[in-house]
Regions:
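Conserved ABC transporter NBD signature motif
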Residues: 80-88
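Charged, flexible cofactor/metal-binding loops and thiol motifs
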Residues: 4, 12-14, 28-32, 248-337
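A short, proline-enriched helix->beta-strand linker immediately N-terminal to the Walker B motif
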Residues: 180-184
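P-loop NTP-binding/switch modules centered on Walker-like glycine-rich loops
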Residues: 187, 191-195, 199-278
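Conserved ABC ATPase "signature" region
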Residues: 87-88, 138-156, 265-266
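ABC ATPase NBD coupling module
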Residues: 30-35, 89-105, 123, 131, ...
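Conserved ABC ATPase signature
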Residues: 161-165, 169
Length: 337
């Protein structure tokens, strides 16, 4: 059956649209010395749709947490466009930014550090409602108790303190608090890396269930591709502030085309795809300083396949084999189906 344009299902508006995002920090070198400039994020673009998860992966220092701080409105990008619900954050007024902050919430790596140890769980959950709404105390308590149940905790937990819970339970509380204002986007910065493996699976399943039930979008920051495999729909691989490969998870995991992505996947037990390395790839060379990144490809100092062109010419992020990749040699890694 053919459907006319009028009968077609409407396309949902993206929760987040980022175009050429940059974040540059001014680094003081002391008296009488000119300041250095550290480019933590260099022209990164991506989109996050409702009900979908974009995982941002890479080593420490790659810029993924800086990206999370920009999307969560903790920092303002130096340049580029960042649209939340169609509103450009960079150009937004203070009043608009205040309203946008309700639509984006954070879940941190260490749940114990993000929960006030002197307050009961009920008070912690009610706090966002007390600050941002005009609900009375009874309504706030009802919503907080309902949220506890939604994340799998019991009614008696309402009057307990954070130190009385396990790490997994504390992360459930942190997730519940993030959901109190009914956000469209959750920015999860390494939300399970501090938990035992068995507890990680429970929290990941909870996040997946909440996404399906509430239509949430996730920006999921992680260095663990084993975790990303279970939670993500799309993947953005970063290195030294640059996006070097991005696309659908199933496409990239089955056949990574950037040598850095190949090395990350090869170092993760249990991930096997058509293009996955048969043995671990050992990266040689030093991780460059972000204050003085290499010319040409940012990965050229550690790449096992480097050629002369890699040192002199920076590869653009281009469409290839169902994803975007920034590598001069990417075609040689494509394997026949």
């Amino acid at each position: 059956m053919n459907l006319s344009t009028q009968d077609a299902m409407p396309v949902a508006e993206p929760v987040v649209v980022a175009r050429e995002l940059k974040q540059v920090y001014k680094i003081s070198r002391g008296f009488l010395h000119p300041a250095d400039h550290l480019q933590a994020v260099s022209g990164v673009s991506f989109t996050v749709q409702p009900g979908k998860t974009l995982a941002v992966v890479g080593e420490s220092g790659c810029g993924k947490s800086t990206l999370a701080r920009m999307v969560s409105l903790i920092e303002t990008p130096t340049s580029g466009e960042l649209l939340l619900g169609g509103v450009d954050v960079v150009k937004a007024s203070p009043q608009q930014r205040h309203a946008l902050r309700r639509t984006v919430q954070l879940v941190f790596q260490n749940p114990f550090g993000s929960l006030n140890p002197r307050k009961k769980i009920g008070t912690i959950l009610e706090s966002p409602l007390e600050i941002n709404t005009e609900l009375d105390a009874k309504s706030r308590a009802e919503q907080a108790r309902a949220m506890l149940a939604l994340v799998g905790l019991r009614p008696e937990h309402f009057d307990r303190y954070p130190h009385m819970f396990s790490g997994g339970q504390r992360q459930r509380i942190a997730i519940a608090r993030a959901l109190m204002l009914k956000p469209a986007l959750i920015v999860a910065d390494e939300p399970v890396s501090a938990l035992d493996v068995s507890i990680q699976a429970q929290v990941l399943n909870l996040l997946a269930d909440l996404q399906q039930e509430l239509g949430l979008a996730y920006l999921f920051i992680s260095h663990d591709l084993g975790v990303v495999r279970h939670i993500a729909h799309d993947v953005l691989v970063m290195y030294l502030g640059h996006a070097i490969e991005q696309g659908e998870k199933k496409t990239i995991f089955a056949q990574p085309l950037h040598p850095y992505t190949q090395a990350l996947l090869a170092s993760t037990p249990g991930i096997v795809g058509a293009g996955a390395a048969k043995k671990r790839i050992v990266l040689t060379g030093e991780l460059p300083s972000p204050l003085s990144p290499p010319g040409g490809c940012v990965f050229s100092t550690r790449c096992p396949h480097v050629v002369a062109k890699c040192h002199s010419e920076r590869p653009p992020l281009r469409e290839l084999s169902g994803r975007q990749v920034a590598c001069h040699l990417a075609e040689q890694f494509i394997q026949p189906a």
